[in-house]
């Protein structure tokens, strides 16, 4: 289903209850909003027959805590499947990297997809190379599971550890 706000309406909750009652397999491919997961909703989501996994958006550092809270609630009611996180890469390299790495360190049950931020009002926007490289590393699991981002070599002669050195020069005290 393509409704990232399904948890925000009573009608949406009724639809999920119907999905559970009918035993339908479902995928909310636009990601759910973890901030809206209550104990009752977690209990309901744990009963859903997911096609693959539960999807959440995790576009800011504050959403990590909300996703963690939601995961704990849903798991409390017996869900043992995978979780998938959409991570938009914003302007801050360190913040984006730390958010992505948080889920990497949680293990294979937590899968994520990264996408550079695209400004729909600026069709000529230039995507920073670090965003391209970070999303390339994350989204291709053969790289993501076999090396750390610092060691990732997206182009001959360039390792991504360079991004950490560049940021240290830009940010005093880093």
What are these regions (language model features)?
Residues 1-70, 81-91, 111-115:
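Core AdoMet radical
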Residues 20, 71-78, 101-104:
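Surface-exposed amphipathic alpha-helices with a cationic face
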Residues 16, 58, 62-63, 68-76, ...:
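Generic hydrophobic segment detector
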Residues 20-23, 49-50, 75, 138, ...:
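Generic secondary-structure transition motif, activating predominantly at the C-termini of alpha-helices
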Residues 88-174:
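Auxiliary Fe-S-binding modules of radical SAM enzymes
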């Amino acid at each position: 289903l393509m409704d990232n706000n399904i948890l925000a309406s009573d009608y949406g909750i009724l639809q999920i209850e119907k999905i559970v009652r009918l035993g339908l397999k479902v995928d909310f491919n636009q990601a759910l909003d973890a901030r809206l997961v209550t104990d009752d909703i977690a209990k309901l989501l744990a009963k859903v027959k997911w096609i693959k996994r539960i999807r959440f958006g995790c576009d800011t550092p504050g959403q990590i805590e909300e996703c963690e809270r939601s995961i704990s609630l849903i798991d409390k009611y017996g869900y043992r499947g995978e979780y998938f996180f959409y991570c938009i890469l914003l302007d801050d390299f360190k913040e984006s990297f730390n958010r992505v790495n948080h889920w990497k360190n949680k293990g294979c049950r937590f899968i994520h997809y990264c996408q550079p931020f695209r400004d729909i009002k600026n069709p000529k926007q230039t995507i920073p190379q670090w965003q391209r490289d970070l999303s390339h590393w994350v989204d291709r699991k053969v790289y993501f599971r076999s090396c750390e981002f610092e060691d990732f070599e997206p182009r001959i002669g360039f390792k991504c550890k360079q991004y950490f050195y560049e940021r240290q020069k830009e940010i005093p005290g880093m």
